[in-house]
């Protein structure tokens, strides 16, 4: 471990950019250090950091721009494994300058007597991704401090019609009945987001299969796969979740039994947030399609055989098959 006193505030990301700007003179670092008040924005909008497993696409660097982030790290052993949450496939959405789907944070460490809370914030439940049987992603039976998670990036592309991040991972491969997760996130014009999940495997046993969505501060209600969310700025969104098998739904907010619907911005600090859970009890395979769109925007999803479709205003249709994404 190296003891360092730079940057000036280890808990503030902008301090790192400030130090980098002072060392390099780069105006994009100055832009980040001053939250856009000085300097110039980065020339590039979309970034893929494959070793770190961070994939980000955005519309721009202004205060009313949007971005989405998909997480897909490579894990094996040591501190990278020990400090990583069960969040492969996690997606965050920031629309028009505010968080919509968010990360729940860390809350507390194992040295605390609140180990059930530590387990929750580490788990897939506290992230916007697939949960299976409360299995810790990548763990191998009988092997400690090793998590064999591998993520494959299928596509990271932008064209005139959409932005796409497409990954798959083996986080549930080491269960007795192995399962695999592929997730595609598509951003369409007008901040329409499509999240497609394909869960496959040997499919011999029944499982507790869930999708979790943790919303930023706001209000969430609804039922039967259609939900209304009002953001902190009072903007209204609609989320629909469906699958090719039966789903049950639950909304938690500040729940202590079961633990669910919490966010932590600092150590031992937590506040309630809305959390949506889509549940299926049974065997894989299962195919999910989730659509998040501003209220009143036409975005009608359906699953027909291998294909998932989303019909948009004007009659355009987004089609996702196993090997292709098309909008026409």
Describe each model-derived feature in a short phrase:
Residues 1-100, 158, 282, 287, ...:
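Carbohydrate-active enzyme catalytic cores, enriched for enzymes
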Residues 71-75, 110-117:
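Short, surface-exposed loop/helix-turn segments at secondary-structure junctions
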Residues 94-96, 107, 133:
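Catalytic-core segments of enzymes that bind and process phosphorylated/nucleotide-bearing substrates
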């Amino acid at each position: 471990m190296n003891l360092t006193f730079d940057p000036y505030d280890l808990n503030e990301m902008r301090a790192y950019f400030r130090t980098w700007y002072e060392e390099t003179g780069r105006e994009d670092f100055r832009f980040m250090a001053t939250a856009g008040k000085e300097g110039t924005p980065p020339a590039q909008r979309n970034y893929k950091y494959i070793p770190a497993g961070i994939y980000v696409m955005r519309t721009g660097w202004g205060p009313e721009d949007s971005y989405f982030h998909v997480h897909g790290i490579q894990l094996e052993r040591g501190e990278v494994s020990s400090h990583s949450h069960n969040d492969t496939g996690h997606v965050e959405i920031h629309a028009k300058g505010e968080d919509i789907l968010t990360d729940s944070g860390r809350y507390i460490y194992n040295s605390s007597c609140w180990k059930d809370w530590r387990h929750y914030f580490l788990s897939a439940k506290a992230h916007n991704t697939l949960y299976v049987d409360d299995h810790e992603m990548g763990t191998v039976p009988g092997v400690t401090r090793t998590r064999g998670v591998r993520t494959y990036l299928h596509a990271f592309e932008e064209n005139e019609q959409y932005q796409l991040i497409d990954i798959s991972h083996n986080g549930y491969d080491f269960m007795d009945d192995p399962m695999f997760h592929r997730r595609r996130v598509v951003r369409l014009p007008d901040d329409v987001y499509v999240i497609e999940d394909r869960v496959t495997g040997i499919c011999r046993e029944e499982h507790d299969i869930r999708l979790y969505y943790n919303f930023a501060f706001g209000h969430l209600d609804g039922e039967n796969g259609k939900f209304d969310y009002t953001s902190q700025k009072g903007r209204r969104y609609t989320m629909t979740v469906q699958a090719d098998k039966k789903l049950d739904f639950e909304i938690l907010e500040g729940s202590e039994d079961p633990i669910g619907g919490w966010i932590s911005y600092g150590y031992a600090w937590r506040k309630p947030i809305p959390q949506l859970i889509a549940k299926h009890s049974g065997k894989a395979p299962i195919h999910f399609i989730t659509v998040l769109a501003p209220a009143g925007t036409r975005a009608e999803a359906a699953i027909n055989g291998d294909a998932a479709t989303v019909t948009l205003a004007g009659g355009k249709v987004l089609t996702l098959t196993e090997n292709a994404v098309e909008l026409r």
